[in-house]
Structure formats: C-alpha cells, structure tokens
C-alpha cells in the first residue's frame, strides 16, 4: 500500500510522528508543502492520496479561486484514478473576534463553509473519497494546544507536534 500526503502547511516526514499510518505502510511520501496540486500530478499508482488543508493557508485575495481550482482538480482526479482520496480540513482561521463574528459571517468563513459543503457533496458521488473534519478532534483538545504560531515562523508549520499525532490518529481511524 502507498500513501501520498499533500498539505497547505509544512508537515514533518518522520515516521515516528506518523506512527498510525506507518502501521499501514512504510511507503508514505510527502509532496511539496503549500502545493496541493502536486498531490494530483503523478504517473504511478497511489492507494491513498491524502490532502491536509488548513484553510488559513488559503486565505487572501484569491481564496475563492484557489478553492475552485482545488475542487476541479479533485473531481478530475477522482474521475481519472481509482485510488482512494482523503481530504482532511481545518477551517480555523485565527479570527477570535467575538464581536465581529456575532453579526456577520465573514467572507472567509463563507468560502470555507462552501468548500466543506462541496467536499461533502463529492463524497456522495465518489465512494473512493473520504472527508475528515479536523476541527472536531481539534476542538476536543482546544485550539490553544493545536495551533502554534511559533512553529509558523520557524518551520512554516501552523500546528504543534501534538497536533500531528491527532491528525495521524484521525486519518488512521478512517
């Protein structure tokens, strides 16, 4: 079995961190971070293509366009290949302004919610597509322990090392 992992943020490749997935296979490859599309471009059979998306990484002027491109590439990939695809998403955007969030659904949240809705819709059309909402296990542990801005400046990794074991466990369970 082979697993290919693409992410919007840097993920360490040490097998010890990915201990649950390593139980399934030793053939785990990590694509270039911040380049989700590299996960779609390969000429060999992959049993599981995993896309780990931190929506905060997609924010900016072209966020909506980035989402549309990813969804189009995902649909094309699902039609072309028979491999399993897992999309793991956290749409936490770091905006903890209670007042701002009380009255308006911020445009970034609208885009994130629409993205999630489209992924769920695709899971009904393609049996080989799975979705993991990372915000569910993350909320259990608390966002303060999950996201670590110090890691962003050091490694371009938004999350703590503890979070990596949570992601590994959640993907393994699916």
Per-range role (PLM):
Residues 14-18, 60-62, 96-103, 142-144:
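A short acidic (Asp/Glu
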């Amino acid at each position: 079995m082979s697993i290919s992992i693409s992410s919007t943020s840097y993920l360490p490749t040490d097998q010890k961190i990915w201990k649950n997935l390593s139980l399934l296979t030793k053939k785990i490859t990590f694509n270039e971070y911040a380049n989700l599309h590299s996960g779609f471009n390969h000429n060999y059979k992959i049993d599981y293509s995993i896309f780990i998306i931190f929506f905060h990484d997609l924010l900016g002027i072209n966020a909506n366009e980035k989402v549309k491109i990813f969804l189009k590439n995902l649909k094309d990939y699902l039609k072309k290949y028979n491999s399993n695809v897992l999309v793991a998403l956290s749409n936490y955007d770091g905006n903890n302004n209670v007042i701002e969030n009380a009255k308006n659904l911020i445009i970034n949240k609208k885009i994130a919610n629409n993205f999630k809705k489209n992924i769920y819709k695709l899971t009904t059309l393609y049996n080989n597509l799975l979705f993991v909402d990372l915000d569910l296990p993350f909320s259990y542990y608390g966002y303060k322990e999950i996201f670590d801005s110090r890691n962003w400046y050091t490694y371009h990794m938004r999350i703590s090392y503890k979070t990596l074991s949570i992601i590994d466990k959640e993907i393994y369970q699916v």
